[in-house]
Amino acid sequence: MFQLLAGVRMNSTGRPRAKIILLYALLIAFNIGAWLCALAAFRDHPVLLGTALLAYGLGLRHAVDADHLAAIDNVTRKLMQDGRRPITAGLWFSLGHSSVVVLASVLIAVMATTLQERLDAFHEVGSVIGTLASALFLFAIAAINLVILRSAYRAFRRVRRGGIYVEEDFDLLFGNRGFLARIFRPLFRFITRSWHMYPLGMLFALGFDTATEVALLGISTMEASRGVPIWSILVFPALFTAGMALIDTIDSILMCGAYAWAYAKPVRKLYYNMTITFVSAIVALIVGGIETLGLLADKFMLKGVFWNAVGALNENFCQLGFVIIGIFTVCWVVSIVVYRLRRYDDSEVRA
């Protein structure tokens, strides 16, 4: 953990470190504040405190959904290649994602009875929009990663043989060469700041596909029908947002640390990207494929062992998210071990 955070604060000004400390302080304060509101609202209703704990747990769980992590980790690496420190990428993504859920919760609380039929109709359209936006984005990420992987592998081989390190070869995606680079450059040109993840998070949330989001909406509907005041019901989405923002922010900070270590030296940068870029492409393809197949199975009512397995994977994105965290962590650790055992740092690089 400390090595990762050290990687984020590479410059001597101390600003990244101060920003991380401030970010954690704000998130902790937000989490504490949300719980204080819950205690104040439900102090005479211990059952509702249990429901509040459930909403918070839903946020913590939803933060590690596979589509969240794949989008955050890949965009973090892209912004790191642009020379930025996107430690708030995960925060902005989660805020965009949760804002849709919060808005829906408010609408449901206001119109608990009349909105239910409309919610079903919106789910039909929203699920298609949200899933397609998520899957297409991840497929584009996978294609871009494969372009970067090809460029990094060629540059690494040349440098190891005593050749000259050419930065433009590594950054093929952002140069003027390459067919896929020209196709997908507009997509990544849009995301040039951490806050650009906010609208992307909103797109990912439109479908209300996951059990966590549906459960939170169900909680809002249930409590509204019981006569719980609107401001008290808002505690549930606030807790959901607090939990999700905390975990997604931690993820982007950890990824910044891993990528910062890799970019300290040209050879290290090339070697690391050959390993982590390959994993990123595979993860993006798998997650995007699962989402697309799940959408096809749902809309065309496809049955069978294969489609049942696809449905199970879509219903358990949380578990898949933990697998992704493990894959990225193991890949990063193994790349460091192999890199040091082979003494790649001792390679002379001619720029």
UniProtKB/Swiss-Prot annotation:
InterPro entries: Ni/Co_transpt, Ni/Co_transpt_high_affinity. GO terms for cellular component: plasma membrane. Residues 41-51, 116-128, 221-243, 291-316 are periplasmic. It is found in: Cell inner membrane. The keyword Transmembrane helix applies. The chain crosses the membrane at residues 20-40, 52-72, 95-115, 129-149, 200-220, 244-264, 270-290, 317-337. Keywords: Cell inner membrane, Cell membrane, Ion transport, Membrane, Nickel, Nickel transport, Plasmid, Transmembrane, Transmembrane helix, Transport. It is a multi-pass membrane protein. Residues 1-19, 73-94, 150-199, 265-269, 338-351 are cytoplasmic. GO terms for molecular function: nickel cation transmembrane transporter activity. The keyword Membrane applies. It comes from the Bacteria. Belongs to the NiCoT transporter (TC 2.A.52) family. High-affinity nickel transporter responsible for nickel uptake. Necessary for high levels of activity of hydrogenase and urease. Does not transport cobalt. PANTHER family: HIGH-AFFINITY NICKEL TRANSPORT PROTEIN NIC1 (PTHR31611:SF0). This is High-affinity nickel transport protein. It comes from Cupriavidus necator (strain ATCC 17699 / DSM 428 / KCTC 22496 / NCIMB 10442 / H16 / Stanier 337).
